[in-house]
Amino acid sequence: MEQLLDQFLSGVLSEWKAFILQEAKQTYFQELLAKLKNVEQELTPKASQVFRPFSFFAPNNTKLIIYGQDPYPNPQHACGLSFASNAPKLPQSLKRMILRLQQEYPELAGQNHWTKQLLEGWAQQGILLLNGVFTTNAFQTNAHRNWGWEQFNCHLLDFLLSQKLYVLLVFLGKQTENFVLKKIGGASQFASLSYPHPSPLTGRKFFDHPDALFKQINQWLKHHNHTPIDWTNGQVQYQF
C-alpha cells in the first residue's frame, strides 16, 4: 500500500503532501488503499495523477474548488483534474463547458486553439479541480463510490478551514454537492454555487441555467479581493 500511496503523491507540493500523509494514517484511508490495491481492473486516472490537483499551488493560494463527480471512465480522458483531459478528442463534458464559456463570453465564440490543456491553466490560477470520488475502474462509472474518497474530501475542507481561507465551492452536479454541503453546514468560510453537470445526459439544463457560471465566479473573486480567473489562460483577449 505504501508503494501505491507513493505513486499517488507524485508531484504533490509539500504542504498538501503533509495533509495527505496525516490522512493516510487514518483507518478509512488505509481501507481505501487496500481496496484500490486489490482492484483487478485498470484504475483511472493512473496512480501518478490521482492527486494531481495538489501539484499547482500551496493551500493558502486556494481561491475556489470546482467539483465534478468521478473521473472519466475512459483512461485516455482522465488526467486527475475534474473535467480536464489531454486526449486529442475532447470528452463531451469538457466540450460543453467550453461552449458554456463561449455562451457567457460571445467574443470567444469560434476560438478553439486554446482548448488543449485548458483546465490545467485554470488550476495554475488557484482552482482545485476535484471529483467527489478520485478514482474509478476503467470504463465503469462510480465504481469506487463510498470507498472513502468522500471522507477524504470532507477532511480536506476541514484542512482548508484550518488555513483561515474563504473559499468558493462550485458544484457541477448533485452527487458531490449533497455530501459536501452536509459536511460544511453553515461554515461561514465557504460560499457555494450549484449548477447542473455538463454531461450530455443532463440535456440542456447546463446551458439553460439562468445564472452565469464563469462570470459569477469572477464576480465573487473580485468581491473578495482575488484576481479573477483568466478562463483562456491569456491566449485570447476578452473582458472579465
UniProtKB/Swiss-Prot annotation:
UniProt entry keywords in alphabetical sequence: Cytoplasm, DNA damage, DNA repair, Hydrolase
Coiled coil feature spans: none
Enzyme Commission identifier(s): 3.2.2.27
Cellular compartment(s): Cytoplasm
Example of a GO MF term: uracil DNA N-glycosylase activity
CDD domains, alphabetized: UDG-F1-like
This protein's record includes keyword Hydrolase: yes
GO CC aspect terms: cytoplasm
DNA repair found in the keyword field: yes
BP-aspect Gene Ontology terms: base-excision repair, AP site formation via deaminated base removal
Primary localisation category: cytoplasm
Location of the active site: 70
Catalysed reaction, written as an equation: Hydrolyzes single-stranded DNA or mismatched double-stranded DNA and polynucleotides, releasing free uracil
Pfam families for this protein: UDG
Enzyme class, UniProt record, top EC level: hydrolase
Family according to the record: Belongs to the uracil-DNA glycosylase (UDG) superfamily. UNG family.
Function: Excises uracil residues from the DNA which can arise as a result of misincorporation of dUMP residues by DNA polymerase or due to deamination of cytosine.
Protein name: Uracil-DNA glycosylase
Organism: Mycoplasma pneumoniae (strain ATCC 29342 / M129 / Subtype 1)
Chain's gene name: ung
